[in-house]
């Protein structure tokens, strides 16, 4: 998984023992936008649909992950809803389990903050694009009327 590619193998092994297996059926809600995030997810098999009121809908599939920001910034509200687009096998990691392992691997914290920062920047770019498109849409409407 890309999120853990540069991580200490012992750190990854410790986390793997704490992963919880979860199964979702088509159209099951996995994450609700606006709620406080307490865990991240890894897709073992299946496809999920990520829907946000502020960004275009996207799909994630086998090997992808989502919700990682909640491990780094645990009181942040979810910026998107996630639904199963097929029968999904997921593994989840809670913020409590993540932090308990992180206590023994302090150097990993920097790595995860950097990765989370990259994901936040990607989300900001989508939000900016969304607002630019809305602005242009209303300008075109004004010109037509």
Report the location of each language-model feature.
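A small-molecule sensor/coupling module
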Residues: 12, 71, 77-80, 95-132, ...
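Compositionally biased, intrinsically disordered low-complexity regions enriched in proline and serine
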Residues: 25, 90-92, 114, 138
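Regulatory nucleotide-sensing modules
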Residues: 1-89, 96-100, 144-145
